[in-house]
From Swiss-Prot:
Residues 78-90 have a biased composition (Basic and acidic residues). Forms a complex with ATP6V1B1 and NHERF1/EBP50. Interacts in a pH dependent-manner with CA2/carbonic anhydrase 2. Interacts with CFTR through NHERF1/EBP50. Interacts with USH1C. Pfam families: Band_3_cyto, HCO3_cotransp. The modification Phosphothreonine is found at T951. This is Sodium bicarbonate cotransporter 3. InterPro entries: Band3_cytoplasmic_dom, HCO3_transpt-like_TM_dom, HCO3_transpt_euk, Na/HCO3_transpt, PTrfase/Anion_transptr. Disruption phenotype: Deafness and blindness due to degeneration of sensory receptors in internal ear and retina. Mice show impaired hearing and reduced locomotor activity and rearing/grooming behaviors. Show defects in the mucosal protective responses to luminal acid, both in the pH recovery of enterocytes after luminal acid exposure and in the acid-induced HCO3(-) secretory defect in the duodenum. Knockdown in mesenteric small arteries leads to a dramatic decrease in the Na(+)-dependent base influx and in steady-state pH. The PDZ-binding motif mediates interaction with the CFTR, NHERF1/EBP50 complex and probably with USH1C. The modification Phosphoserine is found at S57, S60, S89, S155, S238, S250, S268, S271, S275, S424, S960, S1033. GO terms for molecular function: active monoatomic ion transmembrane transporter activity; monoatomic anion transmembrane transporter activity; sodium:bicarbonate symporter activity; solute:inorganic anion antiporter activity. Belongs to the anion exchanger (TC 2.A.31) family. It catalyses: hydrogencarbonate(in) + Na(+)(in) = hydrogencarbonate(out) + Na(+)(out). Residues 250-260 have a biased composition (Polar residues). It comes from Mus musculus.
Amino acid sequence: MEADGAGEQMRPLLTRGPDEEAVVDLGKTSSTVNTKFEKEELESHRAVYVGVHVPFSKESRRRHKHRGHKHHHRRRKDKDSDKEDGRESPSYDTPSQRVQFILGTEDDDEEHIPHDLFTEMDELCYRDGEEYEWKETARWLKFEEDVEDGGDRWSKPYVATLSLHSLFELRSCILNGTVMLDMRASTLDEIADMVLDNMIASGQLDDSIRENVREALLKRHHHQNEKRFTSRIPLVRSFADIGILASPQSAPGNLDNSKSGEMKGNGSGGSRENSTVDFSKVDMNFMRKIPTGAEASNVLVGEVDFLERPIIAFVRLAPAVLLSGLTEVPVPTRFLFLLLGPAGKAPQYHEIGRSIATLMTDEIFHDVAYKAKDRNDLLSGIDEFLDQVTVLPPGEWDPSIRIEPPKSVPSQEKRKIPVFPNGSAAMSVGPPKEDDHHAGPELQRTGRLFGGLILDIKRKAPFFLSDFKDALSLQCLASILFLYCACMSPVITFGGLLGEATEGRISAIESLFGASLTGIAYSLFAGQPLTILGSTGPVLVFEKILFKFCRDYHLSYLSLRTSIGLWTSFLCIVLVATDASSLVCYITRFTEEAFAALICIIFIYEALEKLFHLGEIYAFNMHNNLDELTSYTCVCAEPSNPSNETLELWKRKNITAYSVSWGNLTVSECKTFHGMFVGSACGPHGPYVPDVLFWCVVLFFTTFFLSSFLKQFKTKGYFPTKVRSTISDFAVFLTIVIMVAIDYLVGIPSPKLHVPEKFEPTDPSRGWIISPLGDNPWWTLLIAAVPALLCTILIFMDQQITAVIINRKEHKLKFIPMPVLYGVFLYMGVSSLKGIQFFDRIKLFGMPAKHQPDLIYLRYVPLWKVHVFTVVQLTCLVLLWVIKASAAAVVFPMMVLALVFVRKLMDLCFTKRELSWLDDLMPESKKKKEDDKKKKEKEEAERMLQDDEDTVHLPFERGSLLQIPVKTLKYSIDPSVVNISDEMAKTAQWKALSMNTENAKVTRPNTSPEKPVSVTINFEDEPSKKYMDAETSL
């Protein structure tokens, strides 16, 4: 929009009569007192620009609080627009720094403590022949929600996009309108009367139309959540008759769900029956989303036919007041913004209302609005907001497009921290720092025996009880059920494999008992209770090698295994005593992702492998002839060439080949007697059973896809949020229940998980307690330390961070089909791949550059180096898989440790900055860190000492002494340093909006108790006999 058009459009917002006072915004206004000082009074002083050094940092704020707000008043430096020397505002007096000063003040009163805000915008709507009413059109909690045109529904929350012109118009409204801060009122009647009195006194409103405006303000409010059929009856009574519930902390933003329905305030409140709040019209689902202690900000905009120019008011109540019916939810109102204007400009007023509502949701302006002392503070907040906004080109973006809210909102803390004198920001966005990776005290070596364990106990003790109480939630129950089903199957499956490898020495019941003990003990007493210790593939390989060694050298396997277990316990205690966990800081993302990717691939591979294994057990005929199906048979027959094992079995059972009726045996009996299956319908392990295999395939993939669908159900548009969240949390458990029920109803005999029925050792000839020596020689007790060292590394490196609670006596898992559990394995593996950056980088190989996603590391690292990093990581992953799948699996932990050294070698190929984006930085030497820290502290001390020396002391009121740093208070000669308040006043758009105030010469008197005073001091420079002016704002 051009300047002339903008001024013409907004002229009604700024029009004043000839006898009215005008506020001229020239960046800053000041009351200047020119004082001539005698020569001897300023002897030996050079010409300096004197100003108040504003404290911004946290330390300065503490010092400000210590001095007390009663006698330490804020002083602002105001400069005249008619600068004789043409200099701009000093860099320390930008809107950003003024806002930082405002936020740095710490008032002792509780009335100005910022609360969460719920903002609602109502527009005055009317039709010919019908009365006015305020209708809710939008609301803001975190993001904007609009009432859809033509529909009785709310839009999805979206990021509000504002036009720069509407923000300029809003600033003009605050500049020229009525601003009343800390108004004490209890009803909307009182608020309206005080606002109208102020408007009439300032000439903004004519007294003849006062009653019309007042009547419009007190019209009823229609909220979106009210039923359509009730819109024809009065929704609320007149605000003059409505009681209030006022308290600085009243209506905490959440309703008490008890039957009494009490509203808890600060000693005041009423029951649901006695309160004027109509609870039947409160949207309880939305009310739950409002934080406790929240307050309301009401924006009222509209057009009427009795006004010739707009009237504007910004009101802050102190304390906040609950005005029933004004807001759709019963929270106390803190802020009111009113904009009423002549008919024909409703869209313009609507955009101004959206602008102030969006500003109230901004973290910085929100705090400024609470702590503002006068109109200038609010203008500084708007200017700081304008200084931070991002402008989208009009030809490249459609403002009607609604932007989805981001997953995480960026922090605004950097807007609260000032820029250093050298121009560098206090907080800058950059690559992750070195200290961010494994920087917690948990991984720092203490240098004392069991020092880390003692610190862990101290850290965990305060939360030990809450760990149990926090588990009493629906999400924890979902995790328990999921992990129970996911972890019990591997334990029992591993036990079966272990039984085969050790010829029944250790089998399923021992694995189940061991997993239960370690899981419960570790969860109760470990520093991380969400870790489960379970057996893995390398452990199985270790057991196979150890059993083979014992069998070859005629040693007792269980006794030697007991000795190794005792040595392993001792070595683990040594690791704890020496704080060996601190070495984990050398395992960066490079190693973590390779190991995590390997686990995901193992889950996927084993799930598919077990499915193929079912195809071998339940084979099907791949050469069927449909015409000969009736002739297919499969019977049990005597083995033609019985083995020695078969003969030994017959002898032990006291049977002969002739005494058995082979043709009448069942499949299981035939396998028991080592019979042979004969016939065209027989496979390697018995008769063909095609329906079982194909049913297992259906169960397997249905479990996977159903788990994925239910897990993503939270983002679907069906059912209420709570229902969707519950379904998503219990996705895997619900999938297992559904698939078990389907399998039961179909009736196909799919293989089921086998759970031991009795709690007894696999070998009935031994007990639970094994002697570490047994029949072995004495030296085995010592030599067992060598394999124990390798076993310790295996256990230490194979921990998986997850959560599990194992209930050993539960046997309901026997009804779960094995393909369903295999499908769960597949889901666990595939779902875990999504959060690994390594796989995102693999996908970049097949993408052209223009189609690649906007990944943060692609902005700072060349693409070819990203590919090199990925290839190295992929090579290490392949080596891990090859070693794990081969006979050398016992050295698998060593390979994981070797990844650390591979990562260290990459420092030679990549710069530190590139690795900071692709990976975590390796820890440097401790000495280097200490040297850097000492050097930084020394420089800081020297800088502070220099600041103390270069200080001007001026006598102040009441005998106080004003200390002013001189060197830090200089004019900015850097053209990149911009004061947006000054620059905005130069724009054609702002001049067009302010053109009607340029002719006004009378400045509105400053009624603020903290009236800024500016002293112009003339310094005489003796050598050059020249006079220089400097300005002090006190």
